[in-house]
Swiss-Prot record:
The keyword Phosphoprotein does not apply. Keywords: Cytoplasm, Periplasm, Signal. It comes from Pseudomonas aeruginosa (strain ATCC 15692 / DSM 22644 / CIP 104116 / JCM 14847 / LMG 12228 / 1C / PRS 101 / PAO1). NCBIfam families: plc_access_R. Residues 1-21 form the signal peptide. One of its GO terms (cellular component) is cytoplasm. This is Phospholipase C accessory protein PlcR. The gene is plcR. Residues 37-59 are annotated as: Disordered. May be involved in the regulation of synthesis of phospholipase C. It comes from the Bacteria.
Length: 207
């Protein structure tokens, strides 16, 4: 009997000690709780930058030569997205327009542009209107930007006029067949242009 009483008193003593500790350390009123801070807005994970295959879009690797850019576009167009193709084609069209402004032949340039406009406008009627608008702009650029030849260019033109007359006279005197005459004159004039101007179709003669 006595051991049971001893254990009971010991249990009551321990409970009293625990309750006292709780009352001592736990405040009578709860401390005010700060309102919940708005959780930071989740920022979408940054998508890895995919370098465009389009030349205008990736200037670090785009070739400087416009002809090379056109060739690269033709090779890679099938691998581009629709948006990339359109943006690249528009960029090339603008470059071709600028070429006319500095002396390129508007007709040849327009032929190149017509290969690009289907990537800009898929609808046939709208594309036709776009082609017409571009052609008129090219004609305006060509007429406004024509410049007088420099003294050096004038000398080249005079030399070409004199030498080409000699070439034609020599061929007419030595070749009887008309078709052969045309072919011979064409070949010799090409060689003469390359000799004088450095190229077979100099822009100076297209002004």
């Amino acid at each position: 009997m006595r051991p049971t009483l001893t254990w009971t008193l010991l249990a009551l003593l321990l409970c009293g000690t625990a309750i006292g500790a709780v009352l001592l350390f736990y405040p009578s009123e709860p401390a005010p709780v700060a309102p919940f801070a708005s959780p930071p807005q989740a920022t979408p994970a940054a998508k890895p930058s995919i370098p465009s295959r389009a030349p205008e879009m990736n200037t670090a690797t785009a070739p400087d030569n416009l002809e090379q850019q056109l060739g690269e576009f033709g090779r890679n167009a099938g691998q581009m997205s629709e948006i990339e193709r359109k943006q690249a084609a528009e960029g090339l069209i603008e470059q071709l327009k600028r070429e006319v402004a500095v002396g390129a032949d508007p007709r040849q340039t327009f032929e190149e542009i017509q290969r690009l406009t289907p990537y800009v406008e898929a609808d046939a009627r709208r594309r036709e209107a776009l082609d017409f608008e571009i052609w008129m702009a090219l004609k305006d650029n060509a007429s406004v930007q024509q410049q007088a030849p420099t003294p050096g260019e004038e000398e080249q033109l005079r030399e070409y006029a004199q030498e080409s007359d000699k070439v034609i006279a020599e061929v007419l005197a030595s070749v009887d067949d008309e078709e052969q005459r045309h072919a011979a004159i064409d070949e010799r004039l090409k060689a003469l242009r390359k000799q004088i101007f450095g190229e077979e179709n100099p822009r100076l003669l297209q002004r």
